[in-house]
């Protein structure tokens, strides 16, 4: 064995000549004693990814402390850099068909293998115990927090987060008015996921191009108190939710690289996740929006509830695994109640008032053989917004939103519409104007001041 290799003249390891340490020989011996690899910018062991290298430095120090060499901390740093080269493998793909837990490996078909012989990407701190009691406190908590038909969706989503896969292509937002206890879910999940879960901010992910790299190797990112501001850009968030394989990641001051991304996003909020400019169906389609029940008046909250539920971790894991198996059997299509679908539609409508405008009466009507120019269509829309005290979209945003939803509204966007001046312009087939802003009274700034006729004569006199 390498650990018994000694110099012929002194009772010293081969990597130490009495004065100097040979880092390459040290790493060669270290790797024969320790199962560890370096891939995708991180060390991995049978315990999963090394998130804190202090214990690793401690192991190296234990081997070096008998050596009378100067500046051991710097020497340890040098050894770690050499170890990255010595232990490097070209790639370490995630295993999507199994869950590595504290006491072994659980396959999606329910087969369990005890022991931890292999180096793995991630290992959950919870153990697999098929005889674990049902998590009664957890289930009672969910029953008081969520509507019964929405609980299976949460069960499937938590189970979905157990494996490194984004095949479901969904994120989850749990919305309430505050005080319901929804953030207790995050505290319980931290016991199940350990270092494979990260507290983060969806707002930061959307704004900061470096934030995605912080989610590399992570199974679940929890935003415990999502900001209410609408996202200025959504491409970073959407790319994480739909990532299937490697994606371009960037860290500050370093060149971008291709890294594995399979982090799922879970947010708790008092409002909806909205986009400032993105009104595409794709942004909202990827959200599972659960609403909480109202907090009962006079309910006494248990300050130790989270700790009690954490004690049921093994049972909660079995409950989540059941949800994962159901999701996989359904080809990664989540169970969605009518309420969840209505929530998603409401979020979309709140952020894009063209849906309410299209359904309004007295302004337009959908008619197969009718047409309207884009300019007139927008002017009627502005009129509707002003009369309903709503902020109108800009002309380009309105047109883009109408084009994106043309099929849903049975409209056709084309450039052979004839306007009132007889010129051919862009517009829409399938809709007819009822209200005409330039005819039906004042719209926008009035061109003159209206003076009633029944005012006293002396008020009309000018000094």
List PLM regions with ranges.
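P-loop NTPase catalytic core of nucleic-acid-dependent motor ATPases
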Residues: 31-56, 99-100, 105-219, 288-291, ...
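Replication-associated primase and helicase/ATPase modules
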Residues: 1-34, 44, 49-52, 107, ...
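Phosphate-handling catalytic cores of nucleic-acid transaction enzymes
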Residues: 310-352
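Positively charged interface segments
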Residues: 32, 77, 193-195, 200-209, ...
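Loop/turn-to-beta-strand initiation segments
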Residues: 217-220, 261-265
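Alpha-helical scaffold elements adjacent to nucleotide-binding pockets in ATP/GTP-utilizing enzyme cores
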Residues: 59, 63, 185-188, 218, ...
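Conserved nucleotide-sensing/catalytic segment adjacent to the nucleotide-binding pocket
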Residues: 211-254
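Intein modules and their embedded homing endonuclease domains
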Residues: 2-128, 260, 393
């Amino acid at each position: 064995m390498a650990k018994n290799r000694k110099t012929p003249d002194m009772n010293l390891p081969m990597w130490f000549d009495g004065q100097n340490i040979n880092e390459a020989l040290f790493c060669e011996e270290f790797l024969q004693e320790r199962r560890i690899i370096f891939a995708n910018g991180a060390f991995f062991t049978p315990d999963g990814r090394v998130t804190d290298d202090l214990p690793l430095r401690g192991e190296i120090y234990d081997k070096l402390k008998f050596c009378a060499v100067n500046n051991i901390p710097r020497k340890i740093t040098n050894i770690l850099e050499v170890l990255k080269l010595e232990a490097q493998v070209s790639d370490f793909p995630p295993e999507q068909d199994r869950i590595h837990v504290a006491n072994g490996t659980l396959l999606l078909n329910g087969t369990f293998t005890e022991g931890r012989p292999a180096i793995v990407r991630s290992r959950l701190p919870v153990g697999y115990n098929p005889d674990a009691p049902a998590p009664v406190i957890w289930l009672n908590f969910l029953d008081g927090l969520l509507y019964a038909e929405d609980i299976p969706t949460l069960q499937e989503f938590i189970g979905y987060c157990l494996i490194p896969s984004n095949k479901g292509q969904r994120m989850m937002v749990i919305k309430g008015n505050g005080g319901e206890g929804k953030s207790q879910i995050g505290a319980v999940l931290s016991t199940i996921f350990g270092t494979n879960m990260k507290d983060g901010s969806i707002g930061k992910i959307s704004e900061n191009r470096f934030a995605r790299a912080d989610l590399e190797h992570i199974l679940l990112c929890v935003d415990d108190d999502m900001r209410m501001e609408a996202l200025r850009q959504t491409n970073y968030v959407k790319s994480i939710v739909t990532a299937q394989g490697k994606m371009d990641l960037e860290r500050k001051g370093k060149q971008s690289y291709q890294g594995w991304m399979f982090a799922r996003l879970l947010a708790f909020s008092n409002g909806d996740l909205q986009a400032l400019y993105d009104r595409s169906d794709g942004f909202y389609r990827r959200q599972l929006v659960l609403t909480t029940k109202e907090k009962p008046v006079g309910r006494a909250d248990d300050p130790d509830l989270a700790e009690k539920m954490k004690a049921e971790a093994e049972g909660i894991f079995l409950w989540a695994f059941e949800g994962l198996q159901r999701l996989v059997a359904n080809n990664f299509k989540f169970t969605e109640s009518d309420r969840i679908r209505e929530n998603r539609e409401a979020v979309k409508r709140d952020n894009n008032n063209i849906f309410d405008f299209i359904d309004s009466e007295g302004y337009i009507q959908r008619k197969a053989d009718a047409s309207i120019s884009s300019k007139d269509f927008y002017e009627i829309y502005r009129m509707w917004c002003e009369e309903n005290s709503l902020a109108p979209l800009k002309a380009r945003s309105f047109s883009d939103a109408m084009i994106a939803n043309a099929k849903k509204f049975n409209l056709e966007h084309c450039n052979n519409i004839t306007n009132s001046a007889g010129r051919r312009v862009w517009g829409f087939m399938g809709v007819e104007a009822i209200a005409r802003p330039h005819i039906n009274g004042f719209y926008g700034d009035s061109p003159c001041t209206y003076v009633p006729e029944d005012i006293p004569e002396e008020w009309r006199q000018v000094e």
